[in-house]
Amino acid sequence: MNTCLEGMAGEPLPYLIQSDGRVTTLMFLCILIVSLAFSKEKKYLLQQAKFLFINRERSSMFDETNVIDVRYFVLLVFHACIITGFCLYSYFTEKVPILFEKIPHMHLLGGLIGIIPIYMLIKWTLYGIVNWTFFQKVKNSAWTTSFFNLFIWLGILLLPLVLLVVYLDISSPTNLYLIGFVVIIAKIALFWKSFSNFFEKIHGAFHLILYFCALEILPDFVLWKGIELVSNNLILKL
């Protein structure tokens, strides 16, 4: 006689990002990268943070604050890509929740993180082509340094916010406002560096607006709408 009894199927628990060991590993890696970089390159990082908001007339080739070990530079850019990907993940989990019901969270998080270095490479290439065509080599070099230093600092400033979002589960409007505030400050700093580096005279304001909108705002808009379009297509197909 068969004595096996079938029980009622349980309801699956919702995905909790703070309980995912892979996410915890990524967060630990980010904290480790920032801690290691500050322990070795603190003087450079703080000096470059100051130069994001003031215009340095000239720099000395013997000034050691102008040089960073390329290993820490690459690690900090990698860290900024991870953190920016987490910010996109936080936004789209709230705005397109149905997508995360169809595709595993870690697959989407990995995809969003992977988009960032590709996007930054494309944007850097566009900046390089335009700057090489219209501006001097010295100014182009200074701009490239400022561009990546700003991206590095964006990742550093967003790290504590991402930790709060992941582990304290801050409500959606609050975390989006905080992240948005940091991003806006970064855009303002980038706008200022564009002006001080390439358009020092006030009559260049119109060209600055065209330059900034075409190479900074438009690519961001295309990235945003591109992710939304892909998300909608995935929802329809899955």
Q: What are the language-model segments listed below?
A:
Residues 28-33, 73-91, 118, 122, ...:
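Hydrophobic alpha-helical transmembrane segments of multi-pass integral membrane proteins
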Residues 221-238:
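Juxtamembrane boundary at the C-terminal end of a transmembrane helix
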Residues 135-223:
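Hydrophobic alpha-helical transmembrane segments and adjacent short intramembrane/lumenal linkers
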Residues 6-15, 56-72:
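Cytosolic juxtamembrane amphipathic/interface segments immediately preceding
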